[in-house]
Amino acid sequence: MTETVTVLKKEPTCAELVHGQWKERQEDLKDPEYEALAFDYVAPHTFNDQPEGYWRWQFSWGGPSDELRAYVNEHYEIHRLEYWYLDWGDGACIQVQQDADAWAQMEQMIGPR
């Protein structure tokens, strides 16, 4: 009698991938020729459990997708910047430090209003 054993390969979660993906994306952002998909404002309550609006710099879409989300005060100054890595029902984010190049890039894109 032969017994068959099935081994399921677990795909890594977004939480396991987010730091590596952010490192790769930072390299992309150093290239002046790099073109992201979109830059727009996501109003509060656009999505469930999203009370605060944010500026979104979207790099890729679908599964997986990734983006920067800048949360600003009433003077359009960033008070929090997050990098999100998302993939079909899973997602993870990390806080981007204020001294990161991406912070300055987002400030330029948002600009004074």
Show which residues each predicted segment covers.
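Amphipathic, interaction-prone secondary-structure segments
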Residues: 38-75
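Generic detector of well-ordered alpha-helical segments enriched in charged/polar residues
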Residues: 15-19, 23, 69, 103-107
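Hydrophobic transmembrane signal anchors and adjacent membrane-proximal interface regions, especially
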Residues: 3-8, 70, 93-96
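Ser/Thr- (and often Asn-) enriched beta-sheet segments in non-cytosolic proteins
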Residues: 6, 58, 67, 80-85
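Long, contiguous N-terminal structural blocks used for assembly/anchoring
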Residues: 1-50
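Polybasic, proline/glycine-rich intrinsically disordered low-complexity segments
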Residues: 75-113
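Generic surface-pattern signal
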Residues: 23, 27-31, 73, 108-112
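Intrinsic disorder/low-complexity segments enriched in polar/charged and small flexible residues
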Residues: 24, 57-59, 63, 86, ...
